[in-house]
Amino acid sequence: MSDIRDTILKYVLQNSIKFKGAPNPKAIMGKILGENPDLRKKAGEVSKIIAEIIKEIENMPLNEQQAKLESLAPELLNSKPAERKKKELQLKNVKEGAPVVMRFAPNPSGPLHLGHARAAVLNDYFAKKYNGKLILRLEDTDPKRVMPEAYEMIKEDLEWLGVKIDDVIVQSDRLPIYYEYGTKLIEMGHAYVCDCEAEEFRELRANGKPCVCRDLGVEKNLELWNKMLNNEIDGVAVRLKTDIEHKNPSIRDFPIFRIENTPHPKTGTKYRVYPLMNLSVSVDDHLLGMTHVLRGKDHIVNTEKQKYIFDYFGWEMPEYIHYGILKIDGPILSTSKMSEGIKNNEFTGWDDPRFGTLRALKRRGIKPEAIYKSMVDIGVKQADVKYSWENLHAVNKDIIDKDARRFFFVENPKTLIIEGAKITTINLRAHPSREEFGTRELIFDGNIYISDDLEVNKMYRLMELHNIVVEKIENNTIYAKYHSDDFKIAKENKAKIIHWIPVKDAIPTTVINTEGEKIKGFAEKDFKIVNIDDFVQFERFGFVRIDEKKDDEIICYYTHN
């Protein structure tokens, strides 16, 4: 429930700030369920959590509430976020006349997910802003983590996202280059071959003590290095000489090459000596002329490690910009978990709606422009940021709403038979603001599907039609009697308005939600005109993308409310 609690906390704080410290539970409840229809089935829990949070914050000063909301969801502090002037993103130390060169450097272990999108988008944004160059560098020097299909999948994902790549570099094609610079480091006395057991070296490093290998001469190290390259020795690594008493033990003589006997998907068994990230990244960032590098603040230690290599070669370092962690709640992002689940048939593929892959978001109906904008809005702040699905959905809605026809959809349908009502044909607008979309026709004959639970002896209003009174309920069939047409009567009786589908000509429809669940139901007859990849809005349900049209069923993916 922690994710639900975070969602509720945002709206309680927003409401409390709006009403000067006097939050309205009913208004908060309506807002939450309206924005998050999946929570309707947990309305009781939601109500309880709202009450708990209101009690928790009742003595919190408004300025503290505002600070809390600013950290959780800054977009909720202003009811008109579009009117807030955003600071334009800029790069530091852009040299006049020198082209900006940047890189996006994923590991090809699977397709891209939402976490990758931040780096991809921001690098693309700056490369375009400064008329620079963006290199896609596929860092595949760990054969165990490479998925062969990912090389092309990543390119496809970037193209869909609107990221323009100027050049593609594959690190496994560059192993001889890394060997050349490994040789130079050994020749300069800055690196050595180490055959210590891992546990032995770990203990020495923890105590700031060098291992015996560190004092081997250059000639001996070159001999051992050549044996590594010629497959004549095993169980060794090449380490970079740093400060053996450095305050951070991980920086003390860290490894830059290791032996890996796993065949590589691209090169097979041709190579078995592979550079570690800090060596290959340093060499590539220099040789490829990187001017600016964007990466997470979890790489700050790696930047310090790489500085040793740049300094040993006398190279100028790029401008490194470290941004905070992007916390993404909800979908599965672990590539290993996704891959394993696909193999075990737990998931349907890399576009399973439970995933946070770009392919999954595309299948749900999230537009690339919406993702791009959300990442630019987040920017390169050093503070950790929680990803706002509300913002993404709001931007996406702005994009798809104008083309989304409206239809009724009845989930988990129940049959409602109404006595005493005339056969009536009604025509509803296919879109509230697009007259050219025309109308859709519903023919009421007293036999309809609904999804609501109704009560005996209670009045209800069929949307755009009649008032009825329920007489009895037998099994899954509800029997009611026509009462009147006047909407005022429904209002006076506080009649709930329910949407409906004529049983005759109803279109069997399945909506697959973000949990991968199949919601079965019926849509109105005119729904049959839709095409694959169309967006529609099921009234009082949400936006969906049309995924498949069969002879006996239309399958949709739930996009958002």
Swiss-Prot record:
The keyword RNA-binding does not apply. SUPFAM superfamilies: Nucleotidylyl transferase, Ribosomal protein L25-like. Signal peptide: none annotated. It catalyses: tRNA(Glu) + L-glutamate + ATP = L-glutamyl-tRNA(Glu) + AMP + diphosphate. GO terms for molecular function: ATP binding; glutamate-tRNA ligase activity. Its main location: cytoplasm. InterPro entries: aa-tRNA-synth_I_CS, Gln/Glu-tRNA_Ligase, Glu-tRNA-synth_arc/euk, Glu/Gln-tRNA-synth, Glu/Gln-tRNA-synth_Ib_cat-dom, Glu/Gln-tRNA-synth_Ib_codon-bd, Rbsml_bL25/Gln-tRNA_synth_N, Ribosomal_bL25/Gln-tRNA_synth. It is an enzyme of class 6 (ligase). A motif ('HIGH' region) lies at residues 106-116. Pfam families: tRNA-synt_1c, tRNA-synt_1c_C, tRNA-synt_1c_C2. The keyword Ligase applies. GO terms for biological process: amide biosynthetic process; glutamyl-tRNA aminoacylation. Its EC number is 6.1.1.17. Keywords: Aminoacyl-tRNA synthetase, ATP-binding, Cytoplasm, Ligase, Nucleotide-binding, Protein biosynthesis. It is found in: Cytoplasm. Belongs to the class-I aminoacyl-tRNA synthetase family. Glutamate--tRNA ligase type 2 subfamily. Catalyzes the attachment of glutamate to tRNA(Glu) in a two-step reaction: glutamate is first activated by ATP to form Glu-AMP and then transferred to the acceptor end of tRNA(Glu). This is Glutamate--tRNA ligase. It comes from Methanococcus aeolicus (strain ATCC BAA-1280 / DSM 17508 / OCM 812 / Nankai-3). The gene is gltX.
